């Protein structure tokens, strides 16, 4: 009896026993390093560095952790408040800091363009004409790394909406939603062609192409008891398959889906969760990854400006 209980205890999956903090920090650091090389040292970075896509890893980890946070919340509203309030104030501060820094280097001009553009930034609308002093500063594209934030907020809202519907459904429903979210990614280019300008704008600000990356994390969270033990054993196999697929895509110029090859993305998601549960529990008191992710472009821009 005692032996059986011991075995059961070992098999019992421990959700908290993960090192996602490290992976998050690593990914944010990775994105930062890539931007620094690209913009400050102005050299072409080997495509190999695009394989490990920090954004995909961050989306996938969100998908794995956010539904858990939803479960712990008293209600949907509390969840949204907790999540969105974590992101938005710090994002606004970051945007304001970015504007102040740009103004310090290039002089501040208050006009209609600036006001519309600035309000747009605050509500995640990225495609508005930039004021000149912003375009003249740094790499000329204001905080190019913030484009993922609008999708993160959308993920939270979608989670809040469909969580109850999905919660106790059978496996086939989950598989169906997974396939549907992959299909959304695949139809994006066709929609871009047939839709009028307004529709195109909506799509470029929507998480359609990225939702499957987040949902892959959610799917693994839902079936974590079965999936995680397998993934922590097969993670090296996933890495080998991932590298093989990446080499194949590079070699033959193949890419399934928008943004990044779908097979690579899914393998990367499997790797993320596999590695996340391979090193026991590692937690940071402060989550640096978000701050790094937010602020590194301000620094990059200053360096580019000083030249």
Segments predicted by a language model, with ranges:
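Short, Lys/Arg-rich, polar N-terminal cytosolic tail immediately upstream
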Residues: 1-16
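Aromatic-enriched alpha-helical transmembrane segments of multi-pass intramembrane proteins
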Residues: 21, 38, 119-260, 301-307
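Functionally critical transmembrane alpha-helices in membrane proteins and complexes, commonly lining
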Residues: 15-71, 88-91, 208-209, 293-297
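Alpha-helical transmembrane segments of multi-pass integral membrane proteins
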Residues: 242-307
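Membrane-interface junctions at the ends of membrane-embedded or membrane-associated helices
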Residues: 70-78, 165-168, 221-234, 275-287
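Juxtamembrane transmembrane-helix termini
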Residues: 5, 54-86, 90-113, 299
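Membrane-interface helix-loop-helix regions
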Residues: 87-153, 264-272
């Amino acid at each position: 009896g005692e032996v059986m209980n011991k075995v059961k205890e070992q098999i019992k999956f421990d959700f908290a026993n993960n090192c996602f903090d490290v992976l998050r920090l690593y990914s944010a650091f990775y994105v930062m390093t890539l931007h620094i090389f690209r913009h400050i040292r102005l050299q072409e970075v080997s495509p190999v560095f695009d394989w490990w896509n920090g954004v995909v890893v961050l989306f996938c980890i969100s998908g794995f952790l956010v539904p858990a946070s939803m479960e712990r919340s008293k209600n949907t509203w509390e969840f949204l408040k907790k999540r969105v309030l974590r992101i938005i104030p710090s994002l606004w501060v970051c945007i304001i800091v970015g504007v102040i820094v740009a103004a310090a280097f290039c002089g501040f001009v208050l006009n209609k363009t600036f006001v519309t553009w600035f309000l747009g930034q605050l509500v995640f609308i990225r495609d508005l004409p930039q004021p000149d002093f912003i375009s003249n500063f740094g790499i000329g594209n204001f905080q190019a790394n913030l484009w993922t934030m609008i999708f993160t907020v959308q993920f939270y809202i979608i989670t809040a909406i469909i969580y109850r519907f999905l919660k106790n459904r059978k496996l086939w429903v989950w598989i169906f939603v997974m396939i549907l979210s992959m299909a959304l990614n695949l139809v994006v280019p066709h929609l871009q062609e047939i839709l009028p300008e307004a529709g195109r704008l909506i799509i470029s600000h929507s998480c359609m192409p990225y939702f499957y990356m987040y949902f892959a994390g959610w799917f693994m969270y839902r079936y974590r008891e079965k999936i995680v033990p397998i993934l922590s054993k097969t993670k090296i196999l996933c890495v080998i398959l991932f590298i093989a697929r990446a080499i194949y895509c590079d070699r033959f110029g193949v890419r399934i889906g928008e943004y990044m090859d779908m097979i690579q993305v899914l393998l990367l998601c499997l790797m993320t969760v596999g590695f996340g549960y391979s090193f026991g529990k590692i937690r940071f008191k402060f989550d640096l990854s978000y701050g790094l992710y937010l602020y590194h472009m301000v620094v990059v821009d200053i360096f580019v400006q000083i030249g």
